[in-house]
Amino acid sequence: TIQKLAIAPLEEVYKLWEGLGYYNRCRNLHATAQKIAFDLKGNFPDSYEAILELKGVGPYTAAAISSFGFGLPYAVVDGNVFRVLSRFFGIDQPIDSTSGKKTFQQLAQDCLLQKESAAYNQAIMDFGATVCKPDLPECGTCVMNKKCTAFLAGTVAEFPVKEKKIKQRNRWFLFYILEMQGKFAVQKRTGKDVWANLYEFPNNELATEKEWKHA
């Protein structure tokens, strides 16, 4: 329950979360449970604005909970929705830009069936997942192809537009496994780097792969 999660020590919650990754989600979930249990007296907020104030909850999650949980008229914009709207309206604004996100959120809100928001949100997400797919979309049988800007222009594959590519960075660590009488030395990471507040074997971060290979 939310109450049990709220009073549980964070270290215990980490242990139960072990292996799932994304530990920031674990921390946010714990903090949100405490807010609901203690500050809100166990009552889950029932407005978009209040839900958005919960730690770890962004516009997408807040809209989804508002629509599916409370029947409120908020458009849910996920990858499927971005794809459907960008192709149908021929919008070449990058979906990963701040202005692009605002444009698509407003467009989705304008298209929303106010009195049937949950059904509409589910329908457009399902449509993007099964018909207006990223690869090999079913344009030939799509019921909206006569009005789809990208289909009529033969540019379906060009949408949605993205401006950023995630740049991966390699890091090299040398870990020390120190054992004495069946017990191992570990340390707790601090700061805001990777694995924050998690336990690890003592280690050094090396500057280059060559240095790591010859350590």
Question: How should these model regions be labeled?
Answer:
Residues 1-140, 144-153, 157:
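Catalytic cores of DNA base-excision repair glycosylases
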Residues 126-215:
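Intrinsically disordered, low-complexity, charged terminal extensions of DNA damage-control enzymes
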